[in-house]
């Protein structure tokens, strides 16, 4: 019969393999086969079937009710003595989505000199190319050591800031106590998720609720994998683009107008209309409600005004909105009227009726309400730089 084994090691790494055995195969011999596949010593193996721990090593698999196609869970025991040199497990890893850190060094003793020698090697051999894991020396369970390692590696620090903002914020706060609290909380949360997942794998395969949870977990894993592939292959898709603004003038007052071909009409804020001295021309019979992502009240409409773009004076009408963060938005009515085209290759707006071109504004010249990098992001980048520099000075 074919038995599928789902293995979970002490460091939370996982493996799945299948074994072809007979029903009268003893449990102790089955553990020996599992040791060869999982690299977990037979004396540390626990086999679970249908939420029941198989204890008697001399009993056959058939006596426990195992049959062809069944799935069992292999768990590695905790709190065991030192291992033989030839049975050292794989190096544990830190998952930056959950920061799962292996157990303390009490279960696997290691000399300080060995730890110092292995730390740089582990960091060099296990990069964060995928943004998921990084190699950590055996027994690295101290929040202080983890904090020092992250602060000394700018690449890992930037990935941590992107993948795990709460832990990155605690790291950059400069408080070891805060970092330890956040780290331990995420460890506990990750352990609870692992326990729930093990419970699902050992549940009744005919249970609809368990199958629905397994389906949801597989879906989340596919989403994470899709995101990681996108980060590797198309990182530009995670960036933000600057909005299209141009310089113009209305009634002699300089403005920055947002070019939006998806907007039906050209609009202006009430505050901007007051600065341009055109509120006296507002026809309040055209009052209403503008609906889009949200809703805003339309005070009225200015039927005819002049807008200056470069050297051209163009006729335009405005709908005046009561509470609008941007001064003016050039909608499709104005763009079609003057046969405007958006040339993204040249980064210009072309006025079709006159042939005039005006460049779109760079991010530094955009209004504050439309800049994609705010002060908080800039300060976070500065904090990372200062933390890395401080860490380097302390080491020297």
UniProtKB/Swiss-Prot annotation:
Its EC number is 3.4.23.-. Residues 82-139, 376-396 are annotated as: Disordered. Keywords: Aspartyl protease, Hydrolase, Protease. InterPro entries: DDI1_N, Peptidase_aspartic_DDI1-type, Peptidase_aspartic_dom_sf, Ubiquitin-like_dom, Ubiquitin-like_domsf. It is an enzyme of class 3 (hydrolase). The active site is at 260. Residues 1-81 form the Ubiquitin-like domain. GO terms for molecular function: aspartic-type endopeptidase activity. GO terms for biological process: cellular response to hydroxyurea; proteasomal protein catabolic process; regulation of DNA stability; regulation of protein stability. Residues 103-122 have a biased composition (Polar residues). PANTHER family: DNA DAMAGE INDUCIBLE 1 HOMOLOG 2 (PTHR15397:SF3), SODIUM-GLUCOSE COTRANSPORTER REGULATORY PROTEIN -RELATED (PTHR15397). Belongs to the DDI1 family. Probable aspartic protease. Seems to act as a proteasomal shuttle which links the proteasome and replication fork proteins like RTF2. Required, with DDI2, for cellular survival following replication stress. Together or redudantly with DDI2, removes RTF2 from stalled forks to allow cell cycle progression after replication stress and maintains genome integrity. This is Protein DDI1 homolog 1. The gene is DDI1.
């Amino acid at each position: 019969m074919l038995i599928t084994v789902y293995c979970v090691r002490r460091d939370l790494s996982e493996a799945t393999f299948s074994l072809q055995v007979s029903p009268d195969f003893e449990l102790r011999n089955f553990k020996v086969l599992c040791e060869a596949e999982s690299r977990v010593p037979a004396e540390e193996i626990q086999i679970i079937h249908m939420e029941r721990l198989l204890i008697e090593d001399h009993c056959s698999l058939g006596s426990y009710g195992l049959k062809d196609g069944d799935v069992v869970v292999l768990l590695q025991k905790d709190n065991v003595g030192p291992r033989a040199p030839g049975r050292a497990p794989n190096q544990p890893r830190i998952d930056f989505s959950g920061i799962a850190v292996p157990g303390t060094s009490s279960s696997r003793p290691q000399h300080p000199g060995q730890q110092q020698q292995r730390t740089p090697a582990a960091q060099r051999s296990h990069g964060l190319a995928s943004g998921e894991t990084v190699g950590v020396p055996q027994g690295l369970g101290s929040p202080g050591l983890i904090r020092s390692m992250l602060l000394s590696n700018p690449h890992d620090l930037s990935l941590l800031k992107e993948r795990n903002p709460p832990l990155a914020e605690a790291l950059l706060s400069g408080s070891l106590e805060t970092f330890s609290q956040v780290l331990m909380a995420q460890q506990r949360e990750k352990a609870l998720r692992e326990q729930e997942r093990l419970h699902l794998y050992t549940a009744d395969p005919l249970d609809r609720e368990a199958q629905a949870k397994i389906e949801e977990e597989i879906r989340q894993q596919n989403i994470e994998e899709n995101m990681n592939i996108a980060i590797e292959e198309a990182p530009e898709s995670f960036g933000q683009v600057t909005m299209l603004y141009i310089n113009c003038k209305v009634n002699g007052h300089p403005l920055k107008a947002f070019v939006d071909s998806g907007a039906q009409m050209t609009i202006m804020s009430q505050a901007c209309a007051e600065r341009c001295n055109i509120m006296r021309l507002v026809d309040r019979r055209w009052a209403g409600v503008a609906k889009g992502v949200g809703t805003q009240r339309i005070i009225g409409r200015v039927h005819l005004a002049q807008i200056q773009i470069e050297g051209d004076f163009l006729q335009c009408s405005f709908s005046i909105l009561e509470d609008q963060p941007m001064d003016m938005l050039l909608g499709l009515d104005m763009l079609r009227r003057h046969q405007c085209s958006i040339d993204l290759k040249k980064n210009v707006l072309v006025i079709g009726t006159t042939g005039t071109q005006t460049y779109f504004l760079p991010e530094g010249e955009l209004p504050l309400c439309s800049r994609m990098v705010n002060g908080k992001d800039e300060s976070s980048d500065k904090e990372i730089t200062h933390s890395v520099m401080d860490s380097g000075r302390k080491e020297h």
